[in-house]
Amino acid sequence: MAEAAQQEQQNFAIQRIFLKDVSFEAPNSPNMFQKEWNPDVKLDLDTQSRELGEGVYEVILRLTVTVKNEEETAFLCEVQQGGIFTAGQMEEAQLAHCLGAFCPNILFPYARETISSLVVKGTFPQLNLAPANFDALFMNYLQNQASETAEAPAEAPAEA
């Protein structure tokens, strides 16, 4: 009975998944198509969340893919994949993990598909991004925050 009450309090639901922003640039085409294809792929990930209402949150996953070929930019693709989630009655640490890792895990396949589609429409070889471990990224973020806090110099007491 107590477990049922706890599960009822810690509800989670996806309200909506949406594409917030998208950009595709191929600054060196069509010249890029005449070169041997040996790409150097750089992926940047970022997440952001904000509360929309009581227990309702918007989470944005930003992916930026920059592909260079022979030191020239072949293409740059930026996607902001958004989601609106209900996350009620969670402890602060659980909510932070939910918004910083669990929700981005849900959004990533949608963003990955959008990037793949844009790359193919640009007539470049298909780009399949490997899955991201948002749990590990979130833990790394927490460790960095903790070490920054520990390294921050203590403020000198104000003199009277």
Swiss-Prot record:
Cellular component aspect of the GO annotation: cytoplasm
Molecular function via GO: unfolded protein binding
Residues that span the membrane, as ranges: none
This protein's UniProt keywords: Chaperone, Cytoplasm, Protein transport, Translocation, Transport
Keyword Cytoplasm: yes
GO biological process: protein folding; protein tetramerization; protein transport
InterPro entries per UniProt: SecB, SecB-like_sf
UniProt subcellular location: Cytoplasm
Physiological role: One of the proteins required for the normal export of preproteins out of the cell cytoplasm. It is a molecular chaperone that binds to a subset of precursor proteins, maintaining them in a translocation-competent state. It also specifically binds to its receptor SecA.
Family: Belongs to the SecB family.
Assembly notes: Homotetramer, a dimer of dimers. One homotetramer interacts with 1 SecA dimer.
HAMAP family attached to this UniProt entry: SecB (MF_00821)
Protein's name in the database: Protein-export protein SecB
Species of the source: Aliivibrio salmonicida (strain LFI1238)
